[in-house]
């Protein structure tokens, strides 16, 4: 049966970027697309900025506890089921658990897309992978017992939207916020509120304060955060249109974060990054970016000594920054 309509399910802002070019390509082929989302950070704003129609099946986040998560999945299953009965798509694709459940119920193929190893996201492995018709993941990922139903590719999700064929950094966009000719650093603090983030530590206030003090003599500091900040950090906070963040990231001297996605985005853009959280050493695609291609550093929250050794090496080090740009070009050409 020919595919005439595809339903794309988004559960994270990065998934908007992942699918935006795919969406355009499908439309150019005459295939109709629809978006289903749930509340997550700036996801809804990204679709609004691009004037893309969507249906939000979970306008308010339901909390992070087990009961809240169970109720959230049930609600999303029910609402997506009703939507599919009305819309009648030929294919469902995305990164959310509910597409696999509903796909089975309404007999519509569901393709799950991701980049985390299955042992890092055990809930997805238990609740989504068994019902998915196909899993599409980078070849570096550990897929465990789902290896046989996985279609792999030798690349990273981030290159679907940050490859030079799709993205060119523009200093004019950065100038809307500040002068990009003056050295600057980006700090990104994540909420770490996803189900697989339970018990995970990232950048704490004390470490953030010390990082700011260390970097201040070397350039401007701009901070973006998913969580509430202490008053002393507010003067560093900057509000950036979500659609512009990759331009800002591309010209930065360094990204320091506890976010997996933004670290990988910096890596493929050639911006050195320091990723500090308890996932360090556990996620294959980030291990590859950090250890094989040496585009960034993964540092455990407890290893403050190494953090400041790396900061000393990178801050103001134009050679390191230019080397990253060169390595990134070679990595991209490989893919």
PLM regions with names:
Residues 111-114, 120-136, 249:
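A conserved, positively charged/aromatic
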Residues 268-313:
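Catalytic binding pocket for nucleotide-activated donors in carbohydrate/polymer assembly enzymes
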Residues 10, 27-72:
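Conserved nucleotide-sugar phosphate-binding/catalytic loop shared by glycosyltransferases and other
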Residues 91-102, 112, 245-285:
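A donor-sugar binding/catalytic signature common to diverse glycosyltransferases
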Residues 50-63, 105, 187-192, 209-241:
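Catalytic donor nucleotide-activated moiety binding site of glycosyltransferases and closely related
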Residues 76-80, 227-262:
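Donor nucleotide-activated moiety binding/catalytic core segment of transferases
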Residues 132-201:
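A nucleotide-sugar donor-handling region in carbohydrate enzymes
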Residues 312-328:
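Conserved donor-nucleotide binding/catalytic region of nucleotide-linked donor-dependent transferases
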């Amino acid at each position: 049966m020919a595919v005439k309509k595809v339903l794309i399910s988004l559960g994270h802002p990065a998934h908007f970027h992942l699918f935006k070019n795919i969406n355009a390509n499908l439309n150019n082929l005459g295939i109709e697309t629809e978006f289903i989302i749930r509340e997550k950070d700036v996801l809804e704003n990204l679709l609004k900025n691009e004037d893309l129609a969507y249906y939000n099946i979970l306008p308010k986040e339901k909390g992070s506890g087990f009961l809240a998560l169970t109720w959230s999945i049930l609600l999303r299953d029910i609402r997506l089921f009703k939507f599919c009965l009305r819309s009648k798509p030929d294919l469902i694709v995305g990164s959310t658990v509910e597409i696999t459940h509903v796909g089975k119920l309404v007999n519509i193929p569901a393709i799950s897309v991701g980049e985390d190893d299955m042992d890092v996201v055990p809930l997805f492995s238990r609740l989504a992978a068994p019902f998915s018709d196909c899993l599409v993941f980078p070849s570096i990922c550990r897929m465990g017992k789902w290896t046989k139903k996985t279609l792999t590719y030798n690349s990273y999700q981030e290159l679907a939207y940050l490859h030079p064929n799709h993205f060119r950094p523009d200093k004019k966009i950065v100038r809307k916020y500040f002068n990009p000719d003056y050295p600057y650093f980006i700090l990104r603090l994540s909420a770490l509120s996803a189900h697989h983030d339970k018990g995970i530590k990232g950048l704490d206030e004390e470490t953030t304060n010390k990082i700011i003090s260390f970097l201040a003599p070397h350039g401007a500091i701009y901070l973006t955060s998913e969580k509430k900040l202490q008053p002393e950090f507010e003067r560093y906070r900057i509000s950036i249109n979500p659609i512009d963040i990759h331009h800002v990231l591309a010209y930065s001297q360094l990204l320091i974060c506890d976010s997996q996605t933004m670290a990988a985005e910096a890596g493929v853009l050639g911006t050195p990054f320091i990723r500090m959280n308890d996932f360090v050493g556990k996620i294959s695609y980030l291990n590859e970016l950090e250890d094989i291609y040496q585009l960034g550093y993964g540092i455990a929250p407890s290893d403050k000594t190494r953090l400041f050794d790396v900061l000393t090496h990178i801050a103001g080090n134009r050679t390191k920054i230019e080397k990253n740009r060169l390595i990134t070009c070679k990595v991209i050409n490989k893919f």
